[in-house]
Amino acid sequence: MTVQAVALPLKRFLLIEQCPDAWLGLDLYLFQDDAVVFYVGQSQLAFARVWEHLLGGFKGHSITGRFVWVNWPRSMNFTIELLSSQDAQFSHLHNDLNAAEQWLIRQRAPCFNVTHNALATAVPATYLPANAKFRRRISLRKLLFEAERAVKAEDIARW
């Protein structure tokens, strides 16, 4: 069964090693917190592209990924939203991937999108800018361990 959208905290996203089959049709993605969208993007496989941003952030190849890591551990509560351009919400755009991405950018005014974003939202002052120095230079393995611990603690608290 293919889903049309999924949203989950970054800490949970990080624990998913392979793209679930149901997510293979998701071709749009958003990095966001409760108040602001940081980035909107598109890819034939949104799951993999989000991972590219995250991994590229360590080397400065992705401003979005770098922003996530300089704001760690707070950023582990960011939401990763994956969408399908084929969803009914994009029918007025004839479910065109490029048009859907552009529409999301215009509607959500993300911080880091430049193209199609005349009114980009400023990064909230409560966050470090993407060009800030890493406060803690640690490995991806260590970050994944921290995410896993946070998820376990959250799950225990729910019970």
Label the predicted regions.
Residues 1-26, 32-38, 44-159:
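Boundary/linker segments flanking structured domains
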